[in-house]
Every structure is written in C-alpha cells, then in structure tokens.
Amino acid sequence: MHNYLDNIMPDFSIENEILKLKNNKECIIVGVDEVGYGSLAGPVVSAAVFFPNYNNETTQDINDSKKLTPKTRQKIYNKIITRVKWSIGFAHIFEIDEYNILNATHIAMKRALTGLNAHIDIDYVIIDGNKIPNIPWNAQAIIGGDTISTSIAAASIIAKVTRDRLMETLHIQYPQYNWNKNKGYGTKDHITSLYKYGKTIHHRNTFTPISKISYMFKNS
C-alpha cells in the first residue's frame, strides 16, 4: 500500500516559522540528527547543520537519509557540504556502555553543536526526536523532524554518510562481520558472525545480543 507521506519532502517551513516568531531574519537556526542509535557496533554520530540561505530550489533533493539510496545520499552529501555550515559529533563505545544510548546520543549532539558554534553563533536548535539534550541554546525536539525540516534532513545525510564510511573502514579490519553492508546493525549475518567469532572492541557490551553472546563465550 502506498503511503502518500512518502512523497512529502522536507522544507524550511519550520525554520521560517521560527524566524517569524522571533521577528529576526538573522536568527541562526541549526538542525541536528543522529545515526547509529540502534546499531550493535560502532559509535553514535550526530551532525549539526546551518543553511546560510533558505532556498528550496537548491535543496529540493534533500530528504530523510533513510529514504535515500546510498548512491543518491552520497551525491546529495557532496552537494550540501559545500553549501552549509556543519559539524560532526561522536559518542564512542565506552560512552554508550557507561551512560546508555540515549545519553550518549545527547553527548554526540552536544559535541556537534559545540563544534559548529565555534564558527557561528547559534541562536536556536531543532532536533529530530522527542527529547532535548542539555545544551545552552533554545531548542525544539521534533518527532520525524528529518522528514519535515530540510536542516534536520541535511544533518541526517551528513551523519549517515560519515558513519557509514567509518563502518566501511572498520570492515577492513573485521571483514567477518560484514560492516560494509550492515553498518553494525543487528542483521542476520551480523548476529551469526557474533555467535561464530564473538564480539570486538567496537561492539556495545550493554546491548542485549552482545551481553548474551559475551556470557556464552565466557562460560563455554
């Protein structure tokens, strides 16, 4: 069954509404999104993005990264990184295990925003999701924000391409887990390899499949 929502593209409606409410056309509004929340391996990666000019004509192909093919995503990534101000933030495996995935995601978001704020003075932040991290800027969380806001959608693309490249690099060292294809997520082939080879230093120990497999290897 076709979902008509699939045809709806992100735009700058939210950004423009914020500009009107603040009565400030110079207000710097930054979109934030993360990638890797549910993965079994690898870091959480967040991106923060600011468009200097809100122009729908030059951003009409930008969409939620999950709706794009890898080839299209890479093409759009190459185009937008030259047109926006952006920054990346990581939360590493030990942080995910120590602070939990939600808090680690917020750490990654804060790092991305801090990196971007070193170059521009952020006024307002719009974030994909339903929770706002502890940040020193006024912010709004938007469920499904990457399907609504172009700024957030662009952040999702930059974060996704960055993380995918990292997992493809790690695949060279650990080819048995097929990270070049599954990007660390819990696919059937990834789970099968975990039971066969055990975990790596890049796996998240507090995630149930990993903790279960660690216990199995420890007691075998």
Curated annotation (Swiss-Prot):
Gene3D superfamilies: Ribonuclease H-like superfamily/Ribonuclease H. One of its GO terms (biological process) is mismatch repair. It is an enzyme of class 3 (hydrolase). Manganese or magnesium. Binds 1 divalent metal ion per monomer in the absence of substrate. May bind a second metal ion after substrate binding. Its cofactor is Mn(2+); Mg(2+). GO terms for cellular component: cytoplasm; ribonuclease H2 complex. Its main location: cytoplasm. The keyword Nuclease applies. Its EC number is 3.1.26.4. Residues 27-220 form the RNase H type-2 domain. Belongs to the RNase HII family. This is Ribonuclease HII. The lineage of its organism: Bacteria, Pseudomonadati, Pseudomonadota, Alphaproteobacteria, Rickettsiales.
